[in-house]
Regions:
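A short, charged, Gly/Pro-tolerant segment at domain boundaries
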Residues: 263-290
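Short, Lys/Arg-enriched, disordered terminal segments
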Residues: 1-11, 285-290
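Glycine-rich phosphate/diphosphate-binding loops that line cofactor/substrate pockets in enzymes
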Residues: 120-132
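Glycine-rich phosphate-binding loops that contact phosphosugars or nucleotide phosphates
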Residues: 130-248, 252-261
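HTH-adjacent hinge/linker in prokaryotic transcriptional regulators
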Residues: 2-6, 15-18, 22, 32-36, ...
């Protein structure tokens, strides 16, 4: 993918102005750095104006510089080591107003997720979950928190949910080896993508299960063999993976399947409320507590 974009820029070099050629050469040689530069900073770095950078972006086929920047970021996200992420964070964030910067970026991720995820694809994924004999959920490393959140609520909606855990490939396959054609397998992973999750999806697909991938782009290795692709933006804001948009998407999926099973969910919660009350699970708001 990176080669395609850089190749296209290189191929179109002859039709560029002198200043635009400077930008093109810099991006080809330093695309990992250029991906996180503003148009102004990139212009200053190569010695051209900000407007020249903007014109360059449109010249190479993008609506504007932000779209070119996003494309470059997409190309390198899975390549950055933790050390490189820390360096990028330092350059992007600085030490001031971090709260505002991070929350603003997360808001943008949710907005883009809503724009890019089709409602039809989302509803189809929800329907397949409702129809499943068994529901397997897998998320590894930082995605484990997402898988646990989904499993917690799905267990209150369905009797047939299996959260796949384990610190090794052997443990993982021991838990999913019975997955079959009437089951749904949900794999969750974001850059840097988990090899175990990809292998598990391959296995589930070979066994005839319906595969739902929750990931960041159609270029993700999870997308290749899934039946339903649910996309959530997790563009790197720092060395910490942003799970805000993925969690919002999963939250919506939980609500969607819950609304399709309102009667059953209502009965389940009525029983749970009795158990919670009988076994004093939650703190009660009592008056005159000293």
């Amino acid at each position: 993918m990176a080669k395609d974009l850089l190749h296209n820029i290189s191929e179109g070099m002859s039709g560029l102005s002198k200043g635009q050629k400077l930008i093109a050469r810099y991006i080809i040689e330093n695309y990992d750095k250029a991906a996180f530069m503003t148009a102004s900073k990139l212009g200053n770095t190569v010695g051209v104006s900000e407007s020249t950078v903007v014109r360059f972006a449109t010249e190479v086929g993008f609506e504007g510089y932000p779209q070119l920047q996003r494309a470059l970021q997409e190309l390198i996200r899975n390549r950055l080591t933790a050390v490189q992420r820390m360096e990028v964070t330092s350059e992007q964030m600085g030490e001031h107003d971090i709260l505002s910067k991070v929350l603003t970026m997360d808001i943008e991720k949710i907005r883009r997720t809503l724009e890019e995820q089709s409602n039809e694809g989302f509803e189809a994924a929800a329907d397949s979950i409702i129809a499943a004999k068994n529901i397997y959920i897998l998320g590894i490393r930082s995605s484990a928190a997402l898988a646990q959140f989904m499993s917690f609520y799905f267990n209150q909606i369905f009797p047939n949910v299996r959260l796949v855990t384990g610190s090794s490939a052997s443990e993982m396959f021991e838990q999913i080896f019975r997955v079959g054609k009437d089951d749904v397998f949900i794999g969750i992973s974001f850059p840097r993508y988990s090899k175990r999750t990809v292998k598990a999806i391959d296995y589930a697909k070979e066994r005839g299960a319906t595969v739902i991938a929750i990931t960041d782009s159609a270029g993700s290795p999870l997308a290749a063999k899934c039946d339903h692709l649910l996309l959530a933006r997790s563009d790197m804001a720092s060395f910490v993976d942003s799970l805000v948009a993925p969690l919002s998407l999963i939250n919506a999926l939980i609500v969607a399947v819950g609304m399709r099973r309102q009667k059953e969910v209502g009965e389940t919660y009525a029983q749970l409320e009795k158990i919670w009350d009988e076994y004093d699970v939650y703190e009660k708001n009592e008056e005159n507590i000293v």
